[in-house]
Amino acid sequence: MDKLIQTTAAILAGIASFMWGGMDGLLYALISFMILDYITGCLVAIVKKELSSKIGFKGIAKKVLIMALVAVGHILDTHILGGGAFCRSAVIGFYIANEGISILENAGELSIPLPKKLIAVLKQLKSKDDEESEDDKHDSDS
């Protein structure tokens, strides 16, 4: 049984490395933020008596799609652009900012005071991603 568990773990690690480029600090941060966002969203729904399995499933589906987009970024970097981690890092940074802001919004829904510095850092990260998206849009218009 131990051999089966070890083999399964090795296969899953290989798939994860191929799909997402291995577990680094960025990916750990994204996964942590996604879990925290889901949990805080559920807590808000419980407190407001709006808990719904349909909405919960939609939240999980969004998280799966975020991971699919990270995989797209990694595969583009590795197999199309010839190395590096530009696309993967940009995708992860974008979703770290979104998930972080969502966590703050969930906390705000429960009237929890929010640290101004944390708000500023996440907004700065988000605005940096928005600026890069605008630059890309203008480049493609040319």
Residue ranges and their predicted role:
Residues 69-78, 130-133:
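Hydrophobic alpha-helical transmembrane segments in multi-pass integral membrane proteins
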Residues 46-55, 106-114:
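A cytosolic-side transmembrane-helix exit/cap motif
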Residues 20-26:
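Transmembrane helix interruption/hinge and helix-loop junction motifs
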Residues 2-4, 97-142:
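Membrane-proximal cytosolic segments adjacent to transmembrane helices
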Residues 48-69:
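Juxtamembrane helix-capping/reentrant segments at transmembrane boundaries
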Residues 1-19:
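Short, strongly hydrophobic alpha-helical membrane anchors
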Residues 79-109:
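Hydrophobic alpha-helical transmembrane segments and immediately flanking/interface helices
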Residues 17, 30-41, 66-74, 94-102:
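Alpha-helical transmembrane segments of multi-pass membrane proteins
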